[in-house]
Amino acid sequence: MNHIKWLSDLKKAGLLALGKGVITLLKRFSLVIVTLMMSIVVVLAAAKESPGDHVISFDEPIILMISIGIVVFLLIPPLVMSFFGNLVVRIISGVYQCFIVFTFLGLIPIGFLIPNGFLTILVSIAGTLVSIASVAVTLCIGKNKKDI
């Protein structure tokens, strides 16, 4: 209960004044960050269970790092767009994130082709759910009546 008391004291003092817009921004930003982390985890899971020579594996760390770098690079646009609350930017970000959802959905059947690919399937399903939540939050949270 002490931690709640000092939080309320900070709020009364005016030091903790997070507006509705900041909370909305944090929701969008945090879900995009979680999507980024799920993307990195699915690359690592696929590398762990790689069946052949011409796939991502821990045996070739440079290629693995390049793959993770590409994933991070491709998720920078929705990460940057999560800072903006403009309706047009949110729609563009939502459409971009839909491609990420389709990528995670495409990894689910690929996980069945990998021997012992249960971890890849599990992470892909979790990534799909997080990405769908991110799209929903991006498009629905923070709507104003003047935006409609």
From Swiss-Prot:
- Which cell locations does it reside in? Cell membrane
Main localization category: membrane
Give me the segments passing through the membrane: 29-49, 61-81, 99-119, 121-141
* Bilayer disposition of the protein: Multi-pass membrane protein
Source species, domain of life: Bacteria
Q: Which UniProt keywords apply?
A: Cell membrane, Membrane, Transmembrane, Transmembrane helix
**A cellular component term, taken from the record's GO annotations:** plasma membrane
Protein name (Swiss-Prot/TrEMBL): Uncharacterized membrane protein YdeH
UniProt lineage: Bacteria, Bacillati, Bacillota, Bacilli, Bacillales
Q: Which gene encodes it?
A: ydeH
